[in-house]
Amino acid sequence: MLVNREYIRKFLTNNDTKPVPYRWTHGATDEHLGDGLLIYSIIQLLRAKICVCLGSGGGFIPRIMTQARVDLYDTGIFEGDRDYNWGDIGVTYVVDAANKIGGNVDWLEEDSFLRKTFFPRIINETTEIAYKNFFIKEDIKIDYLHIDAGHSYEDVKRDFKQYSKLLSKNGIISIHDTDKNYENNYIVSEDIKDHYKFTDGPSKFIEEISDEWQRFDFFNEGILDTKPSSTGLTILRHA
């Protein structure tokens, strides 16, 4: 067995025994990481240290980012101080205004499972303000960027335009919710209308990506219709 299913179930796909909110959008289950496995693998392969997640309702991707970095240390790739954020293995930043637009967060309190287990650095602001008043001011270069904040076309385009300027030489960008076929098959209950058309912005934006970027779409909707599938993950890197 390549992966520790018990650890995955307790810490990555669940907050101990409670399912991580929105994990299903990644096609994840109790013992399966879904598209999170792609993100984990890319961070491992490219030795990414500075990881930034724009938007995260349940902290699923931030914890995978941190786990990948820690595992790089524990397997002898990273060396030095193992501290999760202030040592030699990099840092995971989560940027989220926690304004309930597009969903709720469950990790804002300091004693939340995510924060006391994986210790991400929280930027409780909009992505636009965080870009200007934190990342620019601290001259941060990003090795892995995950875009999953505002889902309108304008929001996704702005986040990409701004944060892509901060990428390191070998930096990677992933954009979530890019598979419009998933949305076409998904039934939204009347009480959460804010989830309607959640792929419209991301799927429209990726069609406009210039030749300066290599684009890889990872869609598994419809391959196995008896199991959860991802809402779409698109990976971008400089051509």
Predicted regions and their residues:
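S-adenosylmethionine/decaboxylated-SAM
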Residues: 30, 40-239
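Non-catalytic N-terminal targeting/anchoring module and adjacent flexible stem/linker
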Residues: 1-3, 238-239
